[in-house]
From Swiss-Prot:
Family assignment from sequence similarity: Belongs to the universal ribosomal protein uL16 family.
Gene Ontology cellular component annotations, sorted alphabetically: ribonucleoprotein complex; ribosome
CDD domains documented for this protein: Ribosomal_L16_L10e (cd01433)
Single GO biological process annotation from the record: translation
Record bears the keyword Mitochondrion: no
InterPro entries with a match to the protein in the record: Ribosomal_uL16, Ribosomal_uL16_CS_euk_arc, Ribosomal_uL16_dom, Ribosomal_uL16_euk_arch, Ribosomal_uL16_sf
Record key words, sorted: Ribonucleoprotein, Ribosomal protein
GO-annotated molecular function: structural constituent of ribosome
A matching Pfam family: Ribosomal_L16
Keyword Ribosomal protein: yes
Species name: Solanum melongena
Protein name, entry field: Large ribosomal subunit protein uL16
């Protein structure tokens, strides 16, 4: 018996049903890798960022997430190069899908009980996605911005419903806009933290600081 189509589980109708000690025997998700490409590149290397944003409230299967990741990674590797981008899958499939298997052979009505006790067994997992939630994000150099948008356009065909490709105003995966990031960097108030960055704050009263030492040092 083949896998039931994901269109049967697309609508969010019930509560979250995660894997737990009450819900056992859940098959592993098809997607196992959520960061692809140069994930160790510093925050200054890739300033451009583009998102694939869901425009519907729906369930997205782990198979669809894996197919979209492969499509996006394949195009970016071919067009921009394998060390020219960082792709991140932003949703995780934690919701368990159930199936109440029905026999369709001759004499099946004597072997099964129909809809009596129809809770079902775990069949797969999916991610519960809201409107405006980011599905995939790609950061790269400004020269590869068109390649990143085309890669997300191709990944969009792997998902049900509607999605939009939105170019971020932020610097990479950080929460700072481009102008703010460059301004803080010129003032030595930004400390790189992997793919992100930390902003140094002002600790203590300014009156207790020495002249010219209003901000903490980056060391």
């Amino acid at each position: 018996m083949g896998r039931r189509p994901a269109r049967c589980y697309r609508q969010i109708k019930n509560k979250p049903y995660p894997k737990s000690r009450f819900c056992r025997g859940v098959p592993d998700p098809k997607i196992r890798i959520y960061d692809v490409g140069m994930k160790r590149k510093g925050v200054d290397e890739f300033p451009f960022c583009v998102h694939l944003v869901s425009w519907e409230k729906e369930n997205v299967s782990s198979e669809a997430l894996e197919a979209a990741r492969i499509a996006c990674n394949k195009y970016m590797t071919k067009s921009a190069g394998k060390d020219a981008f960082h792709l991140r899958v932003r949703v995780h499939p934690f919701h368990v899908l159930r199936i109440n298997k029905m026999l369709s052979c001759a004499g099946a009505d004597r072997l099964q009980t129909g809809m009596r006790g129809a809770f079902g067994k775990p069949q797969g997992v999916c991610a519960r996605v809201a409107i405006g939630q980011v599905l995939l994000s790609v950061r790269c150099k400004d020269g590869n911005s068109n390649h990143a948008q085309e890669a997300l356009r191709r990944a969009k065909f792997k998902f049900p419903g509607r999605q939009k490709i939105i170019v971020s105003r932020k610097w990479g995966f950080t929460k700072f806009s481009r102008t703010d990031y460059l301004k803080y960097k010129s003032e030595n108030r930004i400390v790189p933290d992997g793919v992100n960055a930390k902003l140094l704050g002002n600790h203590g009263p300014l009156a207790a600081r020495q002249p010219g030492r209003a901000f903490l040092s980056s060391s």
